[in-house]
């Protein structure tokens, strides 16, 4: 009996030691993950600065190093990679996204938002309610538009909250706006549904809801003031009132003769004037909202130590090739 008790005690002690060892190792790893992420952010800033310093390329496009292209020529990025960079005990992989490939919803007017509802596939009867409600959420007054709502509406909800009456800080604030459903926000493609919260996915499976092949999250951002025609989608170009066929062609032309984005034969728009010439009529109206040079980028910093992985997301603002700063960052 005594031997049995001691055996149990020894087993429990061994288990506790194993747990404490694992926790200690994880705590050490967490510290290293943070430094790996910081190293990744510093390298990201360097990459964006070096890209802007290339005098022959006064634009940002998807055939450049930051976007994943590998360089084999005598270039500042020669021999470098964004994939599996060894740092100490760990590795870092960087994935850049041009934030200005989307339209800033805080400067969107009724026409832009109406076009967005059409692209998303929102019912024509619901669209005016959503458009006016978004504009009422952003504007600073308490006077509702014809089909919009202001603070009184939100204070009467089961879980009351106030109307923002100011620009969105995060695009997810749209989920608080009258009429905006998670499916409209995320989209209903299988990949999009995975981005929903567990409750949103449950609701989506239970309800016979419309299919939205596009979404607010694919069209809009809350950062930057101009859209880069070298990195945006055809749908984003259509928000400017550009004909769908022309928008498709403008995007297809970027890929060059081989039809593959990110290769040497890409036909990028080297200046705003270059893009305006391709657009033709109505190009002057785009001038204040289009720029082939981007200032805000998102970078996903995928860190790995052994079998453990963590991802930090950082938003970086580039004023010039020397003044580059992290706006904010968070762990996914």
Predicted regions and their residues:
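Compositionally biased linear targeting/interaction segments
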Residues: 1-332
């Amino acid at each position: 009996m005594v031997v049995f008790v001691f055996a149990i005690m020894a087993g429990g002690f061994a288990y506790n030691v194993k747990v404490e060892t694992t926790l200690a190792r994880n705590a050490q790893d967490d510290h290293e993950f943070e430094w790996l992420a910081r190293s990744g952010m510093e390298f990201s800033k360097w990459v964006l600065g070096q890209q802007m310093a290339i005098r022959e390329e006064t634009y940002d496009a998807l055939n450049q190093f930051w976007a994943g292209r590998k360089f084999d020529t005598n270039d500042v990025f020669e021999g470098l990679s964004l994939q599996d960079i060894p740092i100490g005990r760990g590795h870092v992989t960087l994935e850049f996204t041009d934030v200005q490939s989307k339209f800033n919803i805080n400067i969107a007017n009724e026409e832009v938002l109406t076009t967005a509802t059409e692209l998303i596939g929102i019912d024509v009867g619901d669209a005016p309610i959503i458009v006016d409600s978004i504009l009422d959420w952003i504007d600073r007054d308490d006077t509702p538009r014809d089909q919009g709502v202001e603070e009184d509406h939100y204070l009467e909800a089961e879980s009351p909250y106030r109307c923002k009456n100011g620009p969105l800080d995060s695009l997810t604030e749209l989920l608080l706006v009258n009429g905006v459903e998670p499916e409209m926000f995320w989209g209903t493609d299988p990949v999009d549904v995975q981005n929903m919260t567990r409750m949103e996915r449950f609701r989506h499976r239970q309800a016979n809801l419309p299919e939205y092949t596009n979404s607010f999250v694919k069209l809009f951002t809350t950062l930057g003031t101009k859209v880069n025609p070298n990195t945006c989608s055809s749908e984003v170009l259509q928000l400017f009132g550009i004909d769908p066929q022309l928008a498709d062609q403008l995007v297809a032309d970027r890929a060059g003769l081989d039809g593959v984005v990110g290769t040497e034969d890409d036909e990028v728009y080297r200046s705003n004037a270059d893009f305006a010439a391709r657009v033709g009529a109505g190009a002057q109206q785009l001038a204040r909202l289009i720029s082939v040079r981007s200032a805000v980028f998102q970078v996903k910093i995928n860190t790995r130590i052994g079998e453990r992985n963590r991802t930090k997301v950082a938003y970086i603002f580039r004023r010039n090739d020397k003044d580059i700063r992290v706006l904010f960052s968070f762990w996914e």
